[in-house]
């Protein structure tokens, strides 16, 4: 399996090991510093079965040009960078897209209460 990690510098700023992912097969970590265009994303994802990203937006043309892609994981709580149309198209193509829906929920609640206490 080939896994491409886009936004590698955000997902792993240097304190996490990629070794676990390397055990899954071929790993390509792309440390893009700016928003890549569709052609660049397509080039990076060629031959990949899985992709991981944080904030890079993906459009339909990317999925159309990457027929082997079957799984996309977003290291975020939402799907903001993917349009509803893209999510429907991915479902039609059998591409699984997942996120981390409960990431940071306790920390956000704790922070909100700390801010409320600061007002007292």
Model-derived features: where do they sit?
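N-terminal glycine-/charge-rich "phosphate-binding" loop or analogous flexible N-terminal tail
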Residues: 1-48
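Phosphate/diphosphate ligand-binding glycine-rich loop within oxidoreductases
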Residues: 49-120
């Amino acid at each position: 399996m080939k896994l491409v990690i886009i936004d590698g510098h955000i997902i792993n700023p240097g304190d996490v090991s990629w070794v676990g992912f390397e055990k899954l097969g071929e790993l390509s970590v792309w440390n893009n510093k700016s928003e890549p265009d569709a052609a660049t994303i397509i080039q990076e994802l060629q031959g990949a079965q899985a992709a991981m990203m944080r904030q890079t937006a993906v459009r339909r043309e990317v999925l159309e040009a990457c027929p082997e892609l079957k799984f996309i994981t977003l290291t975020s709580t939402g799907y903001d960078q993917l349009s509803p149309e893209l999510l429907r198209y991915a479902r039609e193509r059998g591409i699984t897209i997942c996120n981390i829906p409960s990431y940071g929920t306790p920390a956000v609640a704790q922070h909100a209460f700390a801010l409320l206490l600061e007002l007292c």
